[in-house]
């Protein structure tokens, strides 16, 4: 009987121990998935709220459900538990093609890189409450082809729209940044390939537009930057191949138009830069095949290479008295140009500047003396003296006879 009781006691003890172990294991699993930070742990823990997941520091990092189970209308809350939501993390909702609408909270300060990129079903973003938003990261909404408009006018704290932030949003028709008075630069590729874009409102605070920022925005018909009184720079190819563009208004503050900035804008018919009194060099209008008239500022000292390359409809350009240099191929194949008047200040004309200008019949040099042509760009070879008294002969020299030479006034 004693042996039986002893055996029973051992079995009971084993059963109690096993039960305790199972309870401990179960409790541990529950705590691992808990949405609350554990007692005694000073570090914030990852937080889950419905389908949203955070890093414990206020940034949503993604979702816990299957992508297809995400709500089509996604409302990001200002708080999850006690955690204030201030950011959307890197690639948090990338490729979530089922999303159609997005509403973001007032607490938000940052939208991370690629946060909503390639959400092709997204048609609407409500940023009306986002008064604290300071940054939209690299590629944040790139490839959101269903998006038709973006109103950032309420985002008065916004200081940065990152590289490629809205690139390839081919359905986008309008963008309003007029209220974003803390933005100083549109970064490169920001609206690259937004071929449906017809209207852009930019803030007066703008100082620069990055390279390729609006490249390929083929539906854009006008760009008015005249109110951007602090704008100094338009980057290379910023409006390249915006072939629907017919009107451009630029401010007096502008000091630089980058190489190819308006290249291939085949709809542009006239260009008035006369008010750009801080501009000393010009480039960027090559391939503007419909351009007929150009007005240059009195401050201009240099026309860069390829500046008006193959602007074949150009019939009139008045060169300012301050001009000292004309770059290589600057007016190459401007076949509509019939006369050019070259100021006394001019000292250098580079190779091919007027080559192929088949309509050019008159070249009037204000100072006809001491002009020589060289074979080398560094003027190191023995030069040829030329006479420029006859305007027709001078035109022939420019377009054909000495078109491939480097001209210099000694």
Regions found by a protein language model. Give the residues of each.
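Bacterial N-terminal signal peptides that target proteins for export
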Residues: 3-16
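Low-complexity, acidic Ser/Thr/Pro-rich repeat tracts that form intrinsically disordered stalk/linker regions
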Residues: 32-48
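Hydrophobic core
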Residues: 17, 21-25
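A structural signal for leucine-rich repeat
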Residues: 285, 377-379
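Structural signature of tandem-repeat unit edges
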Residues: 9-12, 48-58, 69-87, 97-110, ...
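Consensus positions within tandem repeat domains that build extended binding/scaffold surfaces
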Residues: 90-94, 112-117, 137-142, 162-167, ...
